[in-house]
Amino acid sequence: MKVVLASPRGFCAGVNRAINIVEKTIQVYGTPIYVRHELVHNDYVVTQLSKKGVIFIERLNEVPNGSVLIFSAHGVSKKIQEQSKIKNLIIIDATCPLVTKVHKEVSRANRNDMEVILIGHSGHPEVEGTMGQYISVNSRQKIYLVESQADAWSVQVNQPNHLFFVTQTTLSIDDTAEIIAILNKRFPNIMGPRKNDICYATFNRQNALKNLAPMVEMIFVVGSITSSNSVRLMELGRRIGKITYLISHANDIQKNWLRGVNNIGITAGASAPDILVLQVIEKLRVLSTDHVVVEEMIGEEENIFFDTPKI
């Protein structure tokens, strides 16, 4: 059996930065420290940090006054920021800089009295945080969430000639392009960011999967079901026509999946550590009746690094 590893895969600069922030915060303040929402959407990462004394919460009333609170890589709304100040919390912001970029775009459009369309998935914490950057001062100023092409065709805005769009950073490149095309057709004067809001890591991992697909019969995407970019990779693999499984850890693999399969591709979402990929390879060695040969495809080299704030 041949196993081909997608490149790039796994951790992005924003995830590395968020984890480094938590590690440094533990060194400076000790434990417990609190993180609003999962720092990143990966069960393994959350479990490892929990073992070190990190407490993950969803509501601010779970955090004692004066405690250390870290905002997750997905970002938070302005309302959450203000509520945190009232509780006299020590706030450390691990929001990915590329998410912060989108927040600034929304705030700028808001200040310029523009309405905003956010392309994203309802309920995702990044979307909640981005929606929460917009403050409506009257009934004609709103931010709208568009999740699909159908939404793009049906959304009704108050100011079609004074409109700006942004996107969640972890969307399907192809789906988002189709939605933007519809918005441009419906609202010829709509404006958007000068640089794509979909982050480099999402873009690179989806392109890597497209390049990987012709080499293999089956694809494993290593990542959690709550990880937007991991789910998008799974959907992309299936859209291309490959049998594709999203697995959070090696034990998810079933032996009958491998019957008659000689070439398997592996990729990993931007919040999945490489140790999980290594565990998947070892699991395949155990389950396969053949010798397993591992190859890594040539892909886009990533050397992006985000500085961590002073703790």
UniProtKB/Swiss-Prot annotation:
Chain residues that bind [4Fe-4S] cluster: 12, 96, 199
NCBIfam families from the UniProt entry: ispH_lytB, PRK01045.1-2, PRK01045.1-4
Protein name stated in the entry: 4-hydroxy-3-methylbut-2-enyl diphosphate reductase
Residues engaged in binding (2E)-4-hydroxy-3-methylbut-2-enyl diphosphate: 41, 74, 124, 169, 227-229, 271
Gene3D superfamilies: 3.40.50.11270, 4-hydroxy-3-methylbut-2-enyl diphosphate reductase, catalytic domain
Pathway linked to the protein: Isoprenoid biosynthesis; dimethylallyl diphosphate biosynthesis; dimethylallyl diphosphate from (2E)-4-hydroxy-3-methylbutenyl diphosphate: step 1/1; Isoprenoid biosynthesis; isopentenyl diphosphate biosynthesis via DXP pathway; isopentenyl diphosphate from 1-deoxy-D-xylulose 5-phosphate: step 6/6
Annotated active site: 126 (proton donor)
